């Protein structure tokens, strides 16, 4: 599961947005393990997102 193309987009340093929670602002990916992405969002701090249930929009790849 960790090698799925969708999970590979969310590497540490990538910038993302959660379309269902626009007030969270832009977040920076901290880690992605087994489809769970830890993100530090500008307006709400750290959140752990399960990609099986919540969609994320990739804004910018890391590096």
Describe the residue ranges of each PLM region.
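SH3/SH3-like beta-barrel fold
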Residues: 37-42
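Beta-strand-connecting loop/turn residues
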Residues: 34-35, 54
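Short beta-strand-centered aromatic/proline hotspots
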Residues: 25-32
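Intrinsically disordered, low-complexity, charged/polar segments
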Residues: 1-4, 46-63
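Mixed-charge, Lys/Arg-rich low-complexity intrinsically disordered regions
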Residues: 1-15, 23
């Amino acid at each position: 599961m960790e090698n799925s193309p969708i999970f590979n987009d969310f590497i540490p340093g990538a910038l993302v947005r959660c379309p269902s929670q626009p007030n969270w602002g832009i977040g920076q990916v901290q880690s992605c393990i087994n489809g769970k992405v830890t993100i530090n969002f500008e307006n709400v701090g750290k959140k752990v997102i399960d990609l099986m249930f919540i969609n994320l929009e990739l804004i910018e790849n890391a590096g």
